[in-house]
């Protein structure tokens, strides 16, 4: 996978020297062995934190495994930060991130209604900004944008609408081709976009780490995660229904190399 390869190259050439640590999940076939490459290559330079999510995540033993993994990550992050991460810290973070998820879910709905204003490149830029901004500031600005979009009349789009699906689709030059051909993005099933904020973490759980594990367990229709009913084509039907319900005329699937 070129994404994972580029990450390792940027770590090795010093591009990411400002980082104090890196978390390496094992959610796909590339990351499982490559997590050890990260550890061997960067272990003397920064903290390399191994994270193995459970695939059997629905049962109590799966939840407990996930909790144990998150607590290992928490301990490593405490070592980096030089202080304890309290339950209150995690509870506060859950609230902050849930508000951000809600704002982004509202944005993608409004983007479909106002695709004359929110072009594919602008839609991607707004969602991608989440990864680079402090979350309260990002959410506040996005709520302002959502409020302005809600004031506009719903667009009578004369072009084509599609749903995008895949791991990532944020290349501005590629997205500009959509615009040149009068194609709008009605909705997405992209891991880097909507799939990352589809499910909230419970705010009423006494143990906040368990709340995070429950959030992971509640993620569904995810190609990277185990589905005990995959023989029923649940994910395929889910994406097909997304196309129908969003008013799109088709689906564009972005495949990563070797993914």
Task: Name the predicted role of every residue range.
Residues 1-88, 189-192, 197-259:
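Trp/Phe/Arg-rich N-terminal binding region typifying the photolyase-homology
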Residues 67, 71, 75-203:
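A charged, amphipathic alpha-helical module
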């Amino acid at each position: 996978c070129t994404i994972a390869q580029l990450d390792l190259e940027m770590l090795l050439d010093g591009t990411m020297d400002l980082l104090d640590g890196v978390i390496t999940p094992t959610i796909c076939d590339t990351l499982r062995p490559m997590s050890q490459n990260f550890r061997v290559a960067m272990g003397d330079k920064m903290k390399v934190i191994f994270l193995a999510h459970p695939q059997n995540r629905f049962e109590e033993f799966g939840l407990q495994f996930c909790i144990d993994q998150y607590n290992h990550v928490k301990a490593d992050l405490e070592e980096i930060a030089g202080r304890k991460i309290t339950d209150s810290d995690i509870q506060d973070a859950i609230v902050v991130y849930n508000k951000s998820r809600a704002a982004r879910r509202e944005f993608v709905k409004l983007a479909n209604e106002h695709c004359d204003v929110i072009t594919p490149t602008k839609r991607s830029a707004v969602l991608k900004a989440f990864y680079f901004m402090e979350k309260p500031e990002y959410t506040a600005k996005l709520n302002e944008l959502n409020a302005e979009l809600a004031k506009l009349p719903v667009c009578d789009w004369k072009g084509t609408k599609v749903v995008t699906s895949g791991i990532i689709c944020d290349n501005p030059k590629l997205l500009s081709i959509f615009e040149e051909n009068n194609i709008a993005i009605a909705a997405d099933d992209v891991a880097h976009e909507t799939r990352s904020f589809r499910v909230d973490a419970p705010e009423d759980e006494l143990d906040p780490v368990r709340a995070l594990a429950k959030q992971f367990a509640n993620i569904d229709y995810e190609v990277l995660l185990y589905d005990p009913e995959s023989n029923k084509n649940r994910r395929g039907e889910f994406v097909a229904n997304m196309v129908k319900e969003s008013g799109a005329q088709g689906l564009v699937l972005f495949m990563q190399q070797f993914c």
